[in-house]
Design a protein with these regions (language model features):
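Periplasmic c-type cytochrome electron-transfer domains
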Residues: 1-170
Length: 170
């Protein structure tokens, strides 16, 4: 829609390339940075960064349609910039020596006991790149849409740098 879809609390791009988290947005409705072309045109009311002919070829005008990569130098530059964001700041959960603080060790115990790794697992503490949407009981009809249909769940975000990315869904 012209107003966007789904939940609108923006997920941080900090360290995103380093995590390889995959699709963008809580609703996982973009599979490449270049998909923002549609929002530039509809939501922002702009003319876009690629020609109308290229944008309207095949399914390219749909978020998960034909790839837009290589069709606009500006969109590719934006994607390259996002891809350069591969550094995470030092964690407040670690001491200057790199060891987990006592509070972080207690948090690790809760994480293990509650089975958090079933969604927030692996090196990125996420669910694998946006292909698995999860509903942790916070999704309702008013949460928005995903690709024109009711939002079935969210793309489980990384827990890296979680102290800086509130609010949380559970």
């Amino acid at each position: 829609t012209a107003q966007g879809e789904g939940l609108r609390n923006t997920i941080s791009l900090r360290g995103r390339a380093g995590l390889g988290q995959g699709r963008l947005h809580w609703s996982s409705n973009f599979d490449e940075v270049q998909d923002f072309e549609g929002q530039i045109r509809a939501l922002a009311g702009g003319t876009g960064l690629m020609s109308d002919a290229l944008f309207n070829t095949g399914t390219r005008n749909q978020p998960l349609g034909t790839s837009k990569a290589g069709q606009s130098a500006e969109l590719d530059a934006l994607a390259a910039y996002v891809g350069s964001l591969n550094q995470m700041p030092l964690s407040a959960a670690r001491s200057s020596s790199g060891a987990l603080t006592a509070a972080a060790q207690a948090g690790r115990a809760v994480f293990a006991a509650q089975g958090c790794a079933s969604c927030h697992g692996g090196a990125s503490f996420a669910n694998g790149g946006g292909t698995l949407l999860a509903d942790v009981g916070t999704i309702k009809a008013s949460s928005g849409k995903r690709l024109g249909a009711l939002l079935p769940g969210i793309d489980v975000p990384t827990l890296r740098d979680v102290a800086l990315t509130s609010p949380y869904l559970h």
